[in-house]
From Swiss-Prot:
Name of the protein described by the UniProt record: Probable cytosol aminopeptidase
Subcellular location: Cytoplasm
SUPFAM superfamilies hit by this protein: Macro domain-like (SSF52949), Zn-dependent exopeptidases (SSF53187)
GO BP term (any one): proteolysis
Superkingdom in the source lineage: Bacteria
Gene3D superfamilies assigned to the protein according to its UniProt record, in alphabetical order: Leucine Aminopeptidase, subunit E, domain 1, Zn peptidases
Record's compositionally biased regions (Low complexity): 487-502
Protein's organism: Verminephrobacter eiseniae (strain EF01-2)
Gene Ontology CC terms: cytoplasm
Entry EC number(s): 3.4.11.1, 3.4.11.10
PROSITE patterns from the UniProt entry: CYTOSOL_AP (PS00631)
Catalytic activities: Release of an N-terminal amino acid, Xaa-|-Yaa-, in which Xaa is preferably Leu, but may be other amino acids including Pro although not Arg or Lys, and Yaa may be Pro. Amino acid amides and methyl esters are also readily hydrolyzed, but rates on arylamides are exceedingly low; Release of an N-terminal amino acid, preferentially leucine, but not glutamic or aspartic acids
Amino acid sequence: MNFDLKTLELAAAAAEKCDLLLVLIPEGFTPGQDALSTLAALALKNGDLLLKAGKHLQLYQVPAVAARRVILLGVGDGTARAVRQALLALGAEIKKPQTKRLVLCFAAALKAGVASAAVQAVAEASYVYTTTKSKAEARSLSRCVLGVPDAAGARPGFDCGVALVAGVEFAREWSNRPANHATPSLLADAAKTLGRLPHIQCKVHGPAQVRRLGMGAFVAVARGSEQPLRFIELRYSAAAKDQAPIVLVGKGITFDSGGISIKPAPEMDEMKFDMCGAASVLGVFRALGELQPAINVLGLIPACENLPDGRAIKPGDVVTSMSGQTIEILNTDAEGRLILCDALTYAARFKPAAVIDIATLTGACVVALAGVRSGLFANDDDLAVSLYEAGEAALDPCWRMPLDDDYADGLKSHFADMGNTAGRSGGAITAAKFLQKFVAGMRWAHLDIAGIAYKSGPAKGATGRPVGLLVHYLLAQAEAMAQQAPVAPAAPAAPAAPAARPAAKRTGRSQGGLKRTAP
């Protein structure tokens, strides 16, 4: 699908030839004298249109309007959140087969984040998964035009939104694929395709290399599957070489049966989504390739299956992690933290500015936060605030959870340095406390996305979250780093003329000012 941005007032929008013209009208709308304004004013006066977000009035073959259909759409207070809500409420109309060309016309100036939110909402509403269907109907919408009062002012947000659509849909695609179509090897192949984008390189480690690295916990989880593990390493390098990278670590369990501690059969099919953390890292890199911010980012994805087999780990087994710490496997279904702990240890060698792991880690987080917010755990307050603010800006929110030391008491083991689970109570927190044992000396955050990575029921499928949160965080960090870049010294002043001589005539020489240089 193609997105276009243009300056378009309501008067000119009437001449736009399209299958569907959406006129987005906020509260406090002041109508003009054009056909669409008159139409909206009459609908409001007669009570046929309300401006609460999502309320709408659909019209056909409107005189003096070129569009086949017109929908007057209320967008409430006109904020990014309200615009997103309104467009998603109209998803069925956007997704109709006859809607191939869509024009969105904003009846008032855009508020912060609206252009990006609108692009993403249209993409989400029209998304169709087709990869493993023999006769699937592909997305019918081929072009969407955003008509705004000031295209130049909306351009940065629009471009960010288009890049986020690319990243989110890449993540959704790989999350939605069945496990036999998204094995660790296939996931690694997907990562390699990202290496074609600007500033991105990809390296894939196989089982022998992972064993040589000493990733005993990761190797132990993968033993029960015939599919070989993969450790994926993505690098986005667009800043100075000496700038410390931000590391993203994504959990890549491409199917989680629970292992010997096997899960109940109902809804086990959804355990293909246990690699949504990995998919979100891939999605972030896809977006970075479009946006090309001046920052260094490293993506690490430990990918494997968790299956029962004669070689699989058993409850009571003790394994040695890459850090040298030993772990008693009390529950083989607490496997995500085992592959993450080795990846976190590996991340330390890059001396990162921050490390963020992303994982569908615990059902306890779903109980705590449902499908609204990711669970955020962090050992650094500034990092936690930055991620929270990024989530709010991206409409991809998270909520900080506690990390009191007392929560780690349940991880004590009689036979190893720690157990891999501490029971049901506070399960999301104790899982984070386990990971915290492997991030000494690093600024670290953990996003538990078990509740927000995918949906069950009639709308079953991956959401692509938290790609938006992570990209907004990285863009904010790139901007902050650019502002902190060293200031070039001013050119030395010309020597003063000798006092005995007459003053020289002043020329039109330009004077060099202070110049900020990007890292």
